[in-house]
């Protein structure tokens, strides 16, 4: 999404605390979700924590959102934690999509596409007013292109 505002939470991870940092990043992304929103739910090991936190907020705080998953795994987890889901075609767009990335550079340009859900992720992202990307420093590269990507 061109012209997007970038917020930067920067941490350095050791192998022992990678999951804790992913959880922190996933939860921080939930700050962009408020009551009544239509939310694109991305795919990946960090977004998993976003989905878990949104499920907690629905159960404990009464958060009222509708999610649109980008993959079967995301759909299954969202249903498991109680996030109501809809098809993108049934909504008038999305307020925010939260997704991961395969790599990003110091200017916060990014590449996605290493996973199996790329097409659906692109469609959902284009339908959203805002995109929040969650990633840890292991995904940062000096020059984009280090991650092998399939060509569509």
Language model features with spans:
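Glycine-rich beta-strand-to-loop/alpha-helix junction loops that act as flexible
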Residues: 40-46
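Conserved phosphate- and dinucleotide-binding cores of soluble alpha/beta proteins
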Residues: 9-12, 17-24, 72-152
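Conserved SAM-binding loop
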Residues: 40, 66-68
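Short helix-loop-beta connector
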Residues: 32-37
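A short helix->loop->beta-strand "cap" motif at the edges of active sites that frequently abuts
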Residues: 61-65, 128-130
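Active-site catalytic pocket residues across diverse enzymes, especially alpha/beta-hydrolases
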Residues: 54-58
